[in-house]
Curated annotation (Swiss-Prot):
<dbReference type="InterPro" id="IPR050064">
    <property type="entry name" value="IGPS_HisA/HisF"/>
</dbReference>
<keyword id="KW-0368">Histidine biosynthesis</keyword>
<dbReference type="InterPro" id="IPR011060">
    <property type="entry name" value="RibuloseP-bd_barrel"/>
</dbReference>
<keyword id="KW-0028">Amino-acid biosynthesis</keyword>
<dbReference type="InterPro" id="IPR013785">
    <property type="entry name" value="Aldolase_TIM"/>
</dbReference>
<keyword id="KW-0456">Lyase</keyword>
<feature type="active site">
    <location>
        <position position="11"/>
    </location>
</feature>
<dbReference type="InterPro" id="IPR004651">
    <property type="entry name" value="HisF"/>
</dbReference>
<dbReference type="GO" id="GO:0000105">
    <property type="term" value="P:L-histidine biosynthetic process"/>
</dbReference>
<keyword id="KW-0963">Cytoplasm</keyword>
<dbReference type="InterPro" id="IPR006062">
    <property type="entry name" value="His_biosynth"/>
</dbReference>
<dbReference type="GO" id="GO:0005737">
    <property type="term" value="C:cytoplasm"/>
</dbReference>
<comment type="similarity">
    <text>Belongs to the HisA/HisF family.</text>
</comment>
<comment type="subunit">
    <text>Heterodimer of HisH and HisF.</text>
</comment>
<comment type="pathway">
    <text>Amino-acid biosynthesis; L-histidine biosynthesis; L-histidine from 5-phospho-alpha-D-ribose 1-diphosphate: step 5/9.</text>
</comment>
<dbReference type="GO" id="GO:0016829">
    <property type="term" value="F:lyase activity"/>
</dbReference>
<protein>
    <recommendedName>
        <fullName>Imidazole glycerol phosphate synthase subunit HisF</fullName>
        <ecNumber>4.3.2.10</ecNumber>
    </recommendedName>
</protein>
Length: 259
C-alpha cells in the first residue's frame, strides 16, 4: 500500500507567496522559496505551486521562483497556473518541476492532456478540477459541476464525467478542489472526493477546506484520496507538516515519517 501524502499548496503572485479565500482577497504572506524549503524540511511529501498572475512579465518572475525552488528542495513539486500549451509545460519542467498542473486550459482544450502525456509521460500531467456543488440535473447528474477561471465560469460539465475523460486522455493524477470548501477550514468535501476516487483509478488529491489534521485524515480515509492538499493551516503556523503527518499516522494512515 502506498503512503498517503501531505502536499502544501503555495499560490504565487508576482514572485510572492499569497493566500485568499475562495480565490479572492489575496494577501502577501512571504517568500515562496523560503516557505518551500521550510515545508520540505518539515516532511512535506510534495509541494504544489500555482502562478496566479497572468502577464508575460510575471511568468518570467515565476519561472525564476521555480528554478530557485528546485535548488532548495529534494521532493517532487508541481507547477500550475497559466499553462495552456505543451511549450508552457516544457518551460516549467525544464525549470525544475516534476509535474505540471493544468485546469481551465484542459477544460477548454482537452487534447492538451494527451499532448502533455505523450510529450512528458502521464506521471508529469496533473489535471486540476475546480468543482461547485449544484442541484442534480440531467446535465449534471452527480450534483458537482466543473467551473473555471477561479470558479467564476460554470461549464455545464459534470465533474465525474470529466474525471473519467481526463483519465482516458492520459492524465496521471487529479487534484479535486471544492470551490464551496476552499479556504473555509471546515473540512474537505468528502462526498465529492470519494465520488471522484471511486470513478477513476488515478490518484486523487483532495483540495479545499483543511482546517486541522483530522480533516486530512478524513480525506485519505473516508474520502478515498491519495493525498491531502493544504495551505492556510501551515502558511499561518497553526500546524506544522510534521504535526499533521504524525496525527494521521497515529490514527491509522500509512505515512512517510522521515524528517
Amino acid at each position: 500500500m502506498l503512503s498517503k501524502r501531505v502536499i502544501p499548496c503555495l499560490d504565487v503572485r508576482n514572485g510572492r507567496l499569497t493566500k485568499g479565500v475562495k480565490f479572492v482577497g489575496n494577501e502577501d504572506i512571504g517568500d515562496p522559496v523560503e516557505s518551500a524549503r521550510r515545508y520540505y524540511e518539515e516532511g512535506a511529501d510534495e509541494i504544489v505551486f500555482y502562478d496566479i498572475t497572468a502577464s508575460a512579465e510575471a511568468r518570467g518572475i515565476f519561472l525564476d521562483v521555480v528554478e530557485r525552488v528546485a535548488e532548495q528542495i529534494f521532493i517532487p513539486f508541481s507547477v500550475g497556473g497559466g499553462i495552456s500549451s505543451v511549450a508552457d509545460m516544457r518551460a516549467v519542467l525544464l525549470a525544475g518541476a516534476e509535474k505540471v498542473s493544468i485546469n481551465s486550459a484542459a477544460v477548454k482544450n482537452p487534447r492538451l492532456i494527451g499532448d502533455g502525456a505523450d510529450a512528458f509521460g502521464s506521471q508529469a500531467v496533473v489535471v486540476g478540477m475546480d468543482v461547485l456543488a449544484v442541484p442534480e440535473s440531467p446535465e449534471i447528474p452527480s450534483g458537482y459541476e466543473i467551473v473555471i477561471h477561479g470558479g467564476r465560469k460554470r461549464m455545464g460539465l459534470d465533474a465525474i464525467a470529466w474525471a473519467r475523460c481526463c483519465q482516458e486522455l492520459g492524465a496521471g493524477e487529479l487534484c479535486v478542489n471544492s470551490i464551496d470548501a476552499d479556504g473555509t477550514k471546515d473540512g474537505y468535501e468528502l462526498k465529492l472526493t470519494r465520488a471522484i476516487a471511486d470513478a477513476v483509478s488515478l490518484p486523487v488529491i483532495a483540495s479545499g477546506g483543511a482546517g486541522e489534521p483530522r480533516h486530512m485524515l478524513e480525506a485519505v480515509t473516508g474520502g478515498g484520496a491519495s493525498a491531502a492538499l493544504i495551505a492556510s493551516i501551515v502558511h499561518y503556523g497553526q500546524y506544522s507538516i510534521r504535526q499533521c503527518k504524525e496525527y494521521m499516522a497515529a490514527h491509522g494512515a500509512r505515512m512517510r515519517l522521515t524528517w
